[in-house]
C-alpha cells in the first residue's frame, strides 16, 4: 500500500546547497524541502520568495519534497 502524504503550501525563505530549501509553511512551521525529479528535469528555477506546494511524509514532518512552484500574481510568465 502506498504511503499517504500531506500536501502543504509554503514560501521559500532560504536556498541551501544541493537543491535544498528552507520553507515556511502556511501554518508557520519551518521545514527542509528538496526539489522533486520532475521539477529538476524540467529546469524550473526555484528562488527565495517563491510560493510552492510541498509533499510531506506523515512519518517525518520536518522534511518534504517540492512538487509544484505556484505562479506569482504579478509576474508576466
Swiss-Prot record:
Record's keyword terms, sorted: Chloroplast, Initiation factor, Plastid, Protein biosynthesis, RNA-binding, rRNA-binding
Signal peptide residue numbers: none
Keyword Protein biosynthesis among UniProt keywords: yes
All residue ranges annotated as the S1-like domain in the record: 1-71
MF GO annotations: ribosome binding; rRNA binding; translation initiation factor activity
UniProt-annotated location(s): Plastid, Chloroplast
A cellular component annotation (GO) from this entry: cytosol
Keyword check for Chloroplast: yes
Major localization class: plastid
InterPro entries: NA-bd_OB-fold, RNA-binding_domain_S1_IF1, S1_domain, TIF_IF1
SUPFAM superfamilies for this protein: Nucleic acid-binding proteins (SSF50249)
NCBIfam families to which the protein is assigned, alphabetical: infA (TIGR00008)
Protein's job: One of the essential components for the initiation of protein synthesis. Stabilizes the binding of IF-2 and IF-3 on the 30S subunit to which N-formylmethionyl-tRNA(fMet) subsequently binds. Helps modulate mRNA selection, yielding the 30S pre-initiation complex (PIC). Upon addition of the 50S ribosomal subunit IF-1, IF-2 and IF-3 are released leaving the mature 70S translation initiation complex.
Subunit structure: Component of the 30S ribosomal translation pre-initiation complex which assembles on the 30S ribosome in the order IF-2 and IF-3, IF-1 and N-formylmethionyl-tRNA(fMet); mRNA recruitment can occur at any time during PIC assembly.
Family: Belongs to the IF-1 family.
Name of the protein described by the UniProt record: Translation initiation factor IF-1, chloroplastic
Species of origin: Panax ginseng (Korean ginseng)
Lineage of the species this protein comes from: Eukaryota, Viridiplantae, Streptophyta, Embryophyta, Tracheophyta
Chain's gene name: infA
